[in-house]
Amino acid sequence: MLQSLYLGTSIAISWAWGTSLILGMQIAQTKGLEAFLIWATANCLTLVLFGFLYHRKFLNPLVLDQPVVRVFTNLIQIFCLIIQLKILNETLLNFFDPISSYLIASGMGLFLTLLMFQKGLKASIFTDLWQGLLTIVGLSMMAYLCIGIPSNPSPTSSVSDISWGIWSAVILLSGIMTDIQHWQRAKVDDTQKAFYCASVFFAIYLSLVYVLSLYK
């Protein structure tokens, strides 16, 4: 069970990218609760579906060896890294001047890249675990500090907002197939339960995101 939780945390953090915190709040605040629930449910079910299809042999890892697929997945990984470094830089701007925050973010990005290049998947999973714990603790503390502050209820979703939620759900359910991180983690998921644990972790994470979205 501990192995599933350990790997599941890594899967959830890998799936979060770094943009889901801000994006989730924006969806709840602008598109309403119904659209947020569709988007959030799709995010969680995507992890369950991918794990189920992989372990039932419906997904063939050999497809990743195709040159076109390999180029595409590498581009996605670079894109994810850029997004995460951008989020880190914006966070550091709250504490340092622009040049210092840029240098710190670049240095941390280079260090983690070299660490994962040397240690491989094990290092990536280990760093994900600490990111996950810090994220949940941080969001929980922020939610606690909001107790007693008047909240702003989410607007009611319009038909177009719900349509957007359904469209995004379709994209999410298929988009995970192009992310090589999850293929790598599925390969070492000996218990075949890590993706289910990841969906629960991600649901808790998005619940905290929604709570914080009520406080602008």
Task: For every predicted segment, state its role.
Residues 34-116, 171:
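Helix-loop-helix module between adjacent transmembrane segments
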